[in-house]
Amino acid sequence: MKEFIIRDGKKLRLGYTTGSCAAAAAKAAAWMLLSGSKKESIRLLTPKGMELALAVEDIYLSPDCVRCAIRKDSGDDPDITRDTLIYAEVRKTETVGIVIDGGQGVGRVTMPGLDQPVGAAAINSVPRRMIQENVEEVCGLLGYTGGLYVVISAPDGETLAKKTFNPRLGIEGGISILGTTGIVEPMSEQALVDTIHVELRQRREGGADYVLLAPGNYGADYIKGVMGIDPATAVMTSNFIGDTMEMCRELGFRGVLLIGHIGKLVKLAGGMWNTHSRYGDCRMDILTACAAAEGLHGGAAAEMLCCATCDDALRLLKEQGLYDAVLHRLAGRIDDMMHYKCSDIETGAILFSKEYGYLCETKGASKLLRRIKED
């Protein structure tokens, strides 16, 4: 694709999804099967409204079956499916209608709570609709009223899937055929949020009332090494703590417990719900404000503002005899902000650092931890 977007001052090329590849391959294969003529390029209108002109590769034609592939173009997005061939095989059936299934390298759903039911191929709703509509369009143009069986496959899919969330989500044997717009936007935050939502929905439909959240690897390591809990029980929020909490509320969870490094969670005390550094870095400002409220002043406050890390600031608090008081105040502030964010569910947080270990927790954290272990 030649189209691009500007993000953080950089010109980034767009790509197209595995769903677009599958739909285009199915459209091309259906055309060749029903017309009897070879087609080396195909046009596809994506749900986003952008039209793609795609090269058709690895064509196999027979009177009863046609198979072809579209090569995945991820643009400037660091996507593991880049350059993967997504195949569609189309054959006629005696039963009227279009049946869509997954073949080699396309995962199977083994757990409830996902876009597709247990046992179905991991071809999500929008790609399924795209495949259906494009194959129906070809049937209409060529006057075909019989049935078609469409199988989507990705020969490299089983290997690629090991690098994705699929094994964790209960999708076995391959990748998922994804995409809501048909277009890949480089480094899309929405794609990450959507992945978190899928995992939360799966937990909820599995009967969980309480959920453990962690921003990333530090939190996961602490959960395993210090708390003795399988880190797979936690949902990784990345920087999207606010979005994750709101999704928990919307999905009907009764409570959430967030466990994370102070470098991330201190930002919650300032109402920063996306903790990525590009949205600001108020760590020392918040810690210094809490320390000032407990009596820190003058040169010590100025020194804290200049600390490079939270562990440096904690060292200073120990020297000033304010360590426990400031952490207690910080936990209270985080508690207030989490309650303000999601007042209709129970919320809690536990903070730690790599150097000092356990630091503090909000007042409801221990109770939530017990409930999560029981849930």
Where are these regions (language model features)?
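N-terminal charge/polar-biased segments
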Residues: 1-18, 32, 36-39, 140-141, ...
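A structural signal for small-residue-enriched, beta-sheet-centric alpha/beta enzyme cores
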Residues: 3-6, 13, 169-175, 180-199, ...
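Flexible, glycine-rich phosphate/dinucleotide-binding loops
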Residues: 159, 220, 358
